[in-house]
């Protein structure tokens, strides 16, 4: 539908159907107007500079957008104007000193919280208390993605095991480091459960 460029890492669907994309080397968030009549949109309707943008998550309860960059979590307001979209920063939350290069940001299934990973640490951000909490995990550094599911689902983690490359792996593991999936030759950067996401979407939707 669009070619954002700048090494897109994540995308999120906004309540009006528009799509926001995080591009890391482009250092920006791009909002594309969704039009069911068009098969391709050449340009974003809005862009916002975000250093090394890797992630973006819609928070349905608060009606806001979240993105983690460097050692900060940013809370963004969306104006809700489908044909003239805009994002503005509302607040920033600082992580502990020494954190760099935020990677993943993902809702915790069944909780009012999100996992945040940086090059050095993994946190759970309590959205109601607005606090970063430490997480018990087999490895704190360079976690590329974390994904949770309903009861009975393991929390799945992707961390690089690729030697000379520092971003991919052929396997997915759980929070204790146990291997859950492995395929020789695969280069996995991000692993997600394909499940409903009540943090961002209503129970009945068409996405």
Label each region the model flagged.
Residues 1-2, 39-48, 88-96, 131-137:
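A short beta-strand motif characteristic of beta-propeller blades
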Residues 5-14, 50-58, 95-110, 138-154, ...:
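Repeated scaffold domains used in trafficking and secretory/extracellular systems
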Residues 8-10, 16-57:
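Short N-terminal edge-element motif at the start of the domain
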Residues 21-25, 65-71, 114-119, 157-163:
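Conserved beta-strand positions in repeat-built beta-propeller and related beta-rich domains
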Residues 27-30, 73-75, 122-124:
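Structural signal for beta-propeller blades
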Residues 30-37, 131-133, 151-207:
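C-terminal closing repeat unit and adjoining cap/tail of repeat-based domains
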Residues 33-39, 76-86, 126-135:
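Short loop/turn segments immediately following beta-strands, especially the blade-tip
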Residues 69-113, 118-119:
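Eukaryotic tandem repeat interaction scaffolds
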